Every structure is written in C-alpha cells, then in structure tokens.
Design a protein with these regions (language model features):
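Active-site neighborhoods and metal-handling regions in enzymes and metal-associated proteins
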Residues: 1-259
Length: 259
C-alpha cells in the first residue's frame, strides 16, 4: 500500500504519532474520514433505520414499565434492559443524555448519572437516548408527560415545538445551511405567540458510526460551524424549549436529507 513512507493521515492522530515511524509524515486524517462518512449509502440507511426502531421500542417499553413511586435511576434501568432484550447496546454509564431538574428549576443540564428523583405524574421527562445496533448509532426521543399529557402553557409550548420541528424538517434539503434551519425554527415560535424564541436550543449533528460524522474544519481550515446539508446525510434535529419540570419541551427527529 505504500504506507511505509511519505505523508500518511490518521483519523486518530495520537495513534499515528505513537507508531514512531520516522519514514512517514504523520498528518491529521480525522476530517477526511468524517467527510467520507457524512453521506450514507443505502445499506447504511437501513442499518440506521433498524437502530432507530430499537430506540423507539425501548422507549415505549420503558414508559409501559413506569409505576407510581418509580425512581429515575430505576426507570433508566428499565430502558437499558429493554435495549438489551431488543438486541441493542448501551455504553456505560447509560443512554439518557438530558438531565431533568426538579423543584421548579428551569436549568438545561445533562444527566449526571447521579441524579435520582421520584417520577411524579405530570412531570415532563426528556428522552434523548444514545446506543448502537450493529455498530450504527441511534439518537432521539421526545417529551413524555408522566401518566398524563401537556396542559395549559405546556401544551402551547408543545404545539409550538411540534410545529417548529415540522417546518425545520421540511426545510432540511440539500444545500441548506444550519443557520437557515435555526431561523426557520425560531420564526415558528415567534408567529405562534410563544415567548423566549431566542432561548430555544436548535441544533444538529451527523449520525452513523458515531454521533459526529462531520468535518470539524473545512479543507481551507475554516471551522465547519455553519455546515451545509447534502443528499443522504442522516441528521438528527434537536429542539429544546427550556422550562421547569412541568414546562420544558423536547423533540428530536432523525432525518434523512433528500431533495
């Protein structure tokens, strides 16, 4: 292969340097690797569909396992158990990403793995679950109102979030940039009469063998912050309307980009 001399790129730069090969010039190959992986083949699309189905089924099983007085950590265990029964895999320390602060706290936090609380009826639980099936990742979930449904202001926030997600997904076409999609989502909140449109988190990433699948830097060295969609990318859309445990609303949809 001619890899014993010349300029050789490694997606793990540290590994390349540890080889200590004096006859090669070690360069960073992470971005070229991500460039190749960002657009999915038909086979990869099917693998990602299967992984997504495992996540959806595991979420439904977990919800069905809930009972009054159940603790958050026990609920997490039900999700992990369901994933294994369905043939999937969850990395330690767990699949759930978002924290669910209680006591009226509107903070946006990640699950610390030490959080624990009684999952009371009427609480909004944010499902953002990570795992793999046949090495391909799943990512996604929505808001579950424990033993009920959204009411009052929370229902308005939920409806606005659903409408924003629908509008953004419709706009997720080849050539569209992330900043354009964020503007589409915020515009829906403003026209729906919901306050705090600028506080809503709207973000995206690639999905495949990892939860990145994107170049961090373009070929000219410019950070790839406002990246452009391409056909057959698989891109999760995330929208989080912040609030306390009765008002925060979350939706994540995994989207295949098509013309």
């Amino acid at each position: 292969l001619g890899l014993s001399s010349g300029r050789v790129a490694f997606d793990d730069l540290r590994f390349g340097q540890q080889l200590g090969m004096e006859t090669i010039e070690v360069v960073d190959g992470y971005d070229p690797m991500m460039y190749a992986r960002c657009v999915k083949t038909d086979v990869e699309i099917e693998l990602l569909k299967r992984a997504t189905t495992v996540n959806e089924d595991a979420i439904c099983r977990s919800i069905n396992a809930w009972s009054r007085g159940m603790m958050w950590q026990d609920f997490n265990h039900e999700y992990h158990k369901s994933v294994i029964e369905l043939g999937g895999f969850v990395r330690d320390p767990g699949a759930m990403v978002w924290g669910n602060p209680c006591g009226g706290d509107p903070a946006v936090t990640l699950h610390s793995r030490l959080d624990d609380f009684v999952m009371e009826p009427g609480m909004n639980i944010l499902f953002d679950c990570h795992g793999t099936l046949d090495l391909y990742c799943w990512d996604g979930g929505k808001t579950w109102v424990v033993d009920g449904e959204a009411t009052g202001d929370a229902k308005q926030y939920a409806n606005a979030t659903a409408a924003a997600a629908t509008a953004v997904m419709e706009a997720m076409r080849p050539g569209t940039r992330i900043s354009e999609l964020q503007r589409v989502g915020r515009a829906v909140y403003r026209t729906s009469g919901v306050t705090g449109a600028d506080d809503v988190l709207i973000f995206f990433h690639g999905l495949g063998l990892s939860h990145m699948e994107l170049e961090q830097f373009c070929v000219d060295g410019v950070p790839n912050h406002d990246w452009q969609l391409e056909a057959n990318m698989v891109v999760p859309l995330h929208i989080l309307y912040p609030g306390d445990e009765h008002h925060r609303i979350w939706i994540e949809e995994v989207v295949r980009v098509t013309p």
